[in-house]
Design a protein with these regions (language model features):
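Structured segments of extracytoplasmic/periplasmic soluble domains
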Residues: 49-52, 70, 116-121, 143
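Compact, aliphatic and Gly/Pro-tolerant "microcore" segments centered on a short helix or tight beta-hairpin
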Residues: 126-194
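M16 family metallopeptidases and their MPP-like homologs
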Residues: 15-17, 23-43, 60-116, 152-175, ...
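Acidic/histidine-enriched alpha-helical segments
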Residues: 64-65, 120-144, 232-240
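A common structural junction motif
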Residues: 112-123, 220-229
Length: 257
């Protein structure tokens, strides 16, 4: 089978990479949005909060138990930067159907679980749980601060911040600490709803299942995905190189031991 890609819902694209040589199959669901300073931290925080539980599995213990029933299926969060785009969502992996002891079909429940985590997260009073948001905020801020503690990562980030100061590419995939610290469960929920309704969703499957079956599984799993006015991603910008190079020197204490 050849690679398959098409728009299966408004602003939702499915790519299937047929592969029968692996013992596992994977399904990723990632929203692709513009990388900018105001939204980067919100986007980075969102999948971490969504991974804490759903209305049916309201905590990580219940969610983990549900994955265990699917031969130890794993669902991990992903936050990455691709050029001037930020991609956030989940990547799920499970054993391929061919290796299920009882001949179970695992693609459908795996897709359903990913869809449930994105579309039916645990809420209270119409918003994400405050304790989950605050907990994941601490983790996000710790991750942002950790970059400074790794001198190589910090040097690379500072290079991009200075070299691409006027460009989206200069924004960290995790956003900045100041913005992250101001996020609340109310503002994050509103941001999440906007992303669900207008963001471009990229679904990628790699495994041995037939294309028609994969398409049917994800259409069912994401049938409740709200689709409003699509966010039109701006074209990649090209900036002319400056006529003269800039030299910037920063000093930092380094301890060895």
């Amino acid at each position: 089978m050849m690679e398959f890609r098409r728009e299966i819902m408004r602003h939702v694209y499915l790519t299937v990479l047929p592969a029968s040589k692996f013992k596992t199959s994977c399904l990723s669901a990632q929203f692709v949005t513009e990388l900018d300073r105001e939204r980067a931290a919100y986007n980075a925080l969102l999948p971490a909060v969504l991974s804490r539980g759903t209305m049916r599995y309201p905590d990580m213990e219940a969610l983990s138990a549900a994955m265990d029933t699917l031969y130890g299926t794993t669902v991990t969060t992903t936050v990455r930067k691709n050029g001037e785009r930020q991609c956030v969502g989940f990547v799920a992996s499970c054993i391929d159907d061919r290796f299920a002891l009882g001949g179970e079909k695992l693609l459908e429940p795996m897709a359903a679980l990913v869809g449930e985590m994105l579309l039916d997260p645990v809420t209270q009073g119409g918003h994400y749980l405050r304790e989950y948001v605050e907990s994941e905020k601490v983790n996000l801020i710790d991750s942002i601060r950790a970059i400074r503690n790794d001198k190589r990562d910090w040097a690379n980030l500072r290079l991009l911040q200075e070299m691409c100061a006027a460009e989206p590419y200069g924004v960290s995939r995790l956003g900045d600490e100041e913005t992250a610290g101001k996020i609340t469960n109310h503002t994050l929920f509103r941001h999440g709803q906007r992303l669900l309704s207008s963001g471009r969703l990229e679904l990628l499957y790699c495994g041995s299942a037939e294309v028609s079956r994969v398409e049917e599984a994800v259409l069912q799993a994401f049938s409740t995905l709200p689709r409003g006015s699509a966010e039109e991603l701006p074209p990649m910008q090209t900036f002319a190189a400056p006529e003269k190079p800039r030299f910037i020197t920063e000093e930092m204490d380094v301890t060895q031991g």
